[in-house]
Structure formats: structure tokens, C-alpha cells
Amino acid sequence: LLWCWRVWFFFTLSGFDYSRHSIPLDDISDGGPGKDGIPSIDNPHFLTVGEADQSLMQNEDRVTGFVFNDQAREYPIKILNWHEIVNDRVGGNPVVISFCPLCGTGMVFDAHVENRNLKFGVSGLLYQSDMLLTITKQKFYERKLNRRR
């Protein structure tokens, strides 16, 4: 009975639908801030190396970077530490950049799924000490992507 109450409380408290999942629910933990409690960066503004002075970036600063369709992008870790998610477009293609300060991992994903451009946010939840992303239009996600990936 205690386990059932804990699961019900977790489901309703966090506001997510966990009826379909591919990871053990017992391994999901509260990461502190709630859903979108850490604001993502949407449509970021970029500076050239010449525009950025040394107060913004140092040569030894870490970045998460990638090249897509011959376009290179870098996202400073000191910015990602505070926002964790960037929704961006590269060559007209939507991408999401995530960085988990807790485990120090950064990833880049294609945000175009099933003919839709998706926007991601911070869920406030962790799986094995790594952040879980949420799609900001969750009702669309539940309705359109109703199969496990």
C-alpha cells in the first residue's frame, strides 16, 4: 500500500503521465526545480570570436559543440549550467542541446519528429542522476506520439 501511494503521489505531484514508460519508474527521482523551473534558452543569440571579449569567454572555457550541414555551433558550459536546454535552429533544422550539470554530459538531438518541430524544456526529474527532458507541448506529444520509442 505504501508503494502504491508513493507512485500515485509522484504521478500527480509532478504532473506527468507515466502510463507509458521505457525506464523503471522507481529509478526516476526529483531533481529539485519543477517542470520548466529552469528556463530553457530559445532562439539563442550568437557572437563571433571577435565580438566576444575576454569577460565573456576564455580560451580554456568548456563548450558543447557540433557540426551539422557544414555549420558549427558552440554553447558555453557556463551558460548551459544555468539553463540546461537550448532550443535552436541550424540551417533551418530544429535542434535541442541539453547539458546536465549534475553528471556533466551534453547531447544534441534532432527536434524534428514525425513532421513536427518540437520544443523541449527541463522536466525537473532525474534518471540515474541525469536530467530528463520534457516536450513543452506535452498534450501534443501524448496524442501524436502514442507509442514507446
Name these PLM-found stretches:
Residues 1-149:
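Intrinsically disordered, flexible peripheral segments
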